[in-house]
Swiss-Prot record:
Residues 1-18 are cytoplasmic. It comes from Homo sapiens. Gene3D superfamilies: P-loop containing nucleotide triphosphate hydrolases. It is found in: Golgi apparatus, Golgi stack membrane. Pfam families: Gal-3-0_sulfotr. Its EC number is 2.8.2.-. This is Galactose-3-O-sulfotransferase 4. One of its GO terms (cellular component) is extracellular exosome. Belongs to the galactose-3-O-sulfotransferase family. Residues 40-486 are lumenal.
Length: 486
């Protein structure tokens, strides 16, 4: 049969059918034209994602992004970089932050809902919902749940206590009495009892800082003098809450005294932390109680030594895109590398290996936290797929590098002495320099806005969000009895 003539085609299809078919073909052609071009407009020239590259979000079914978030910002663990991406995401999506009056929620005291700016307790008037709680606090679940819904996504980050100790010593040397009295970290770890006193001002920075930040109670600790095993306990012990297996809301209360006086038998010997990290603070059963509670509360705990891998898993858990978790490192100290791992001890000198072992032994509760959440992270990686993860991590790093070259002078962080714009100069504290960023000139207005979000330090970004949520009221000028000068 020969080709159909126009008249025969019209008889077979009919005018209406031909119109529908023509519309379909035109729609497909228009869509292909759109998709074929560079349609990512946020940063022209930086379209790194190729059509064949795997997406972090599942193809089918699609999932809505999680936007009720509780991030426990632990100290000296890379948490400022996570905070930066939360600031940026919430700012871009018009989300409402639970903000402190200044920059921390009364730390080192336990978190209280009353410290959230704009918080109204029940019966105190209409309460606008909060989406993100993410600034420094000592975790207190009972009070957090006064501010955030129980189905929020809870997450945090931990770091190898050996690396954390190095960073904390240089940063908090003037704050911690134990660090201040010690000439060096090596001297402190060689004889920590000669410097450290439980309960002394700022000395929570000197031992088991992660455990402290997570709001966990501390067991009785032996003192150097007189062998007293009854030091002062936490004056405000947290009321721990446990999420029972298969339960919905985080609700069930656990008596912290059960952790202070644990049973002596341990059934799972694989989860014990071997000597020297066992030291003298807390039995294995005490530690396992604490870890079980954290598992019941937190949906994800990131690991600083595997920061990029953790970001990919975070994006997957939140159903966010890759660009949502691509950012610059913040609050990094000069001479320190984010993600530098001491876990394997490979490449360390004998002196460094000794310091690492002593730091983990002294911070044995933090070491238990780290080992536990390192294992849980890698179990999550196995479930996600290592090949898929490697592809996503490579894409994330390529995107970060391209953004740095596009946004920053020299394509990298800068010494703070060269940062003249106060909006981008990070707060300097402690003996180590905290690096910041200098933006390139000549950026388009759209690129300038995006690069500013990426480069803004945490304190300045918090102030920006504060002004956005609580704009200053315009007051009338005061009347004066004297005439004004011309």
């Amino acid at each position: 049969m020969g080709p159909l003539s126009p008249a025969r085609t019209l008889r077979l299809w009919g005018p209406r059918s031909l119109g529908v078919a023509l519309g379909v073909f035109m729609t497909i052609g228009f869509a292909l034209q759109l998709l074929g071009g560079p349609f990512q407009r946020r940063l022209p020239g930086l379209q790194l994602r190729q059509p064949s590259a795997p997406s972090l979000r599942p193809a089918l079914p699609s999932c809505p992004p999680r936007q009720r978030l509780v991030f426990l910002k632990t100290h000296k663990s890379g948490s400022s970089s996570v905070l930066s991406l939360l600031h940026r995401y919430g700012d871009q999506h018009g989300l409402r932050f639970a903000l402190p009056a200044r920059y921390q929620f009364g730390y080192p005291k336990l978190f209280q809902a009353s410290r959230v700016k704009g918080y109204r307790p029940q019966g105190g008037g209409t309460q606008l919902p909060f989406h993100i709680l993410c600034h420094h606090m000592r975790f207190n679940l009972k009070e957090v749940l006064q501010v955030m819904p129980s189905d929020s996504f809870f997450f945090s980050i931990v770091r190898d206590p050996a690396a954390l100790a190095r960073s904390a010593f240089s940063y908090y040397k003037s704050t911690s009495s134990a660090f201040r009295k010690s000439p060096s970290l090596a001297a402190f770890l060689a004889n920590p009892r000669g410097f450290y006193r439980p309960g002394a001002r700022g000395d929570h920075y000197a031992r088991n800082l992660l455990w402290f930040d997570f709001g966990l109670p501390f067991p009785p600790e032996k003192r150097a003098k007189r062998g007293n095993i009854h030091p002062p306990r936490d004056p405000n012990p947290p009321q721990l809450q446990v999420l029972p297996s298969g339960a919905g809301p985080r609700a069930q209360t656990l008596n912290p005294n059960a952790l202070i006086h644990p049973v002596s038998t341990v059934t799972d010997h694989r989860s014990q932390i071997s000597s020297p990290a066992s030291f003298d603070l807390g039995s294995s059963s005490f530690i396992q109680w604490g870890l079980a509670w954290l598992d019941s509360v937190f949906d994800l705990v990131m690991v600083a030594e595997y920061f990029d891998e953790s970001l990919v898993l975070l994006a997957d858990a939140l159903c966010w895109g890759l660009d949502d978790v691509v950012g610059f490192m913040h609050n990094a100290q000069a001479g320190h590398k984010q993600g530098l791992s001491t876990v394997s001890n490979s490449g360390l000198t004998a002196e460094d290996r000794q310091l690492t072992a002593r730091a983990r032994a002294w911070n044995n509760l933090d070491w238990a936290l780290y080992v536990h959440f390192n294992r849980s992270l890698w179990a999550r990686i196995e479930k996600y797929g290592q090949g898929r993860l490697q592809t996503a991590v490579a894409e994330l790093r390529a995107r970060r590098e391209a953004l740095a070259k596009h946004c920053l002078v020299g394509g990298e962080a800068s010494d703070p002495k060269y940062i003249t714009d106060r909006r981008f100069r990070p707060f300097q504290f402690g003996s180590a320099k905290v690096l910041g960023y200098i933006l390139r000139s000549g950026l388009s207005p759209q690129d300038q806005e995006e690069c500013e979000r990426l480069a803004t330090p945490e304190l300045q970004y918090k102030d920006k969000l504060d002004a956005k949520q609580f704009p200053p009221t315009v007051s009338l000028p005061l009347k004066t009895s004297r005439p004004l000068s011309p």
